[in-house]
Swiss-Prot record:
Described function: Sugar transporter that specifically mediates the transport of UDP-N-acetylglucosamine (UDP-GlcNAc) and is required for cell wall chitin synthesis.
Protein name: UDP-N-acetylglucosamine transporter yea4
Keyword Transmembrane: yes
Cytoplasmic topology ranges: 1-3, 53-67, 142-153, 209-214, 296-316
Segments passing through the bilayer: 4-24, 32-52, 68-88, 121-141, 154-174, 188-208, 215-235, 275-295
NCBIfam families: nst (TIGR00803)
Pfam families noted in UniProt: UAA (PF08449)
Alphabetically ordered keywords of this record: Endoplasmic reticulum, Membrane, Sugar transport, Transmembrane, Transmembrane helix, Transport
Residues exposed to the Lumenal side: 25-31, 89-120, 175-187, 236-274
Source organism, top-level taxon: Eukaryota
């Protein structure tokens, strides 16, 4: 299961990152439409799966629906805000930099809210991993300052991403505790976190419609005479399905910190692929960053977490 989850994460998430970068280059304010498309596809696929294979999970889910509510609110906010941030002068390289603090945030929140304790090897490896991603990204974001036309807008985007990091760490702990209490079922998690989020999009119908119309406003046509942006959106949505499928499957088998570390390594791989596919030079910074990322990941894999002193309480 873990090997399968990793293949989905690195295959789906890296493909998703490529399509996302191509899309936001032409449509930087398409974040809400991107998120909505992803949620629709994943919900439809999940509904078909359960209707054909496991109707009982729709009637009587392993995890109570009211338990999912807190997770769904955070999950929806994280996904929407992450994509919305790209419209506030946050370039893809900067996006990777700011989100690379995930493992550190997970550790801090885990220590404060759940009383988790981590070994020195884990703390050191996560810190070095984060530094590696930042060095590699900064070394190749040569035009970083050109994207910051307004420090106020950049500050808003930065704040949004900080909030999503904290929410993501809290959500990871809640999910970890939920799986410990009720048992893990990544299929159920994938479906309910997306399906129960759909009503929130009713408040965002106007920007969704506007962003969809923007895709058809360009003159560049692709396959079947559809705008290239539509195809990038379709590819991004499909890739995101495989990405979140892998993340949910991994989260059902491992800790929140392990998921965060794996996603950080994935971000670095996405950066390297972005450099290659967009014909950017892979300079010394990327090579040095690679050494830090993969070296620290190997150290983390060999480290073990100390038992929690006190976990989150069951509160339904």
């Amino acid at each position: 299961m873990i090997a399968s989850a990793l293949s989905f994460i690195f295959g789906g998430c890296c493909s998703n990152a490529y399509a996302l970068e191509a899309l936001v280059r032409e449509f930087p304010s398409s974040g809400i439409l991107i998120t909505f498309s992803q949620f629709i596809l994943i919900t439809i696929e999940g509904l078909i799966y359960f209707l054909l294979n496991d109707v009982q999970s729709l009637k009587h889910p392993k995890v109570p629906r009211k338990r999912w509510f807190v997770v769904v609110v955070m999950f929806f906010a994280i996904n929407v805000l992450n994509n919305v941030a790209l419209g506030f002068d946050i370039s893809v390289p900067v996006h990777i930099i700011l989100r690379s603090s995930g493992p550190l945030t997970t550790m801090a929140v885990g220590r404060i809210l759940a009383g988790k304790r981590y070994s020195s090897l884990q703390i050191g490896s996560v810190f070095i991993l984060t530094i590696g991603v930042i060095i590699a990204t900064l070394g190749n974001a040569k035009d970083l300052h050109l994207h910051v036309e307004s420090m106020t807008r950049f500050g808003i985007g930065f704040t949004i991403l900080v909030i999503t990091q904290i929410l993501g760490a809290i959500m990871g702990l809640v999910l970890e505790n939920t799986y410990r209490i009720y048992g893990s079922d990544w299929r159920e998690s994938l479906f309910y976190t997306h399906a129960l989020s759909l009503p929130f999009f009713l408040f965002l119908l106007r920007p969704i419609r506007s962003q969809w119309n923007d895709l058809f406003a360009i003159h560049t046509k692709g396959f079947l005479n559809l705008p290239s942006g539509v195809w990038y959106l379709c590819f991004n949505t499909l890739a995101q399905y495989f990405c979140v499928r892998g993340v949910n499957a991994l989260g059902a088998e491992t800790s929140a910190l392990t998921v965060s570390v794996v996603l950080n390594v994935r971000k670095f791989v996405s950066l390297c692929l972005s450099l290659i596919l967009f014909e950017n030079e892979m300079g010394p910074a990327v090579k040095f960053g690679a050494l830090l990322v993969f070296g620290s990941s190997a150290v983390y894999a060999s480290a073990r977490s100390k038992p929690k002193t006190n976990g989150l309480k069951k509160n339904d």
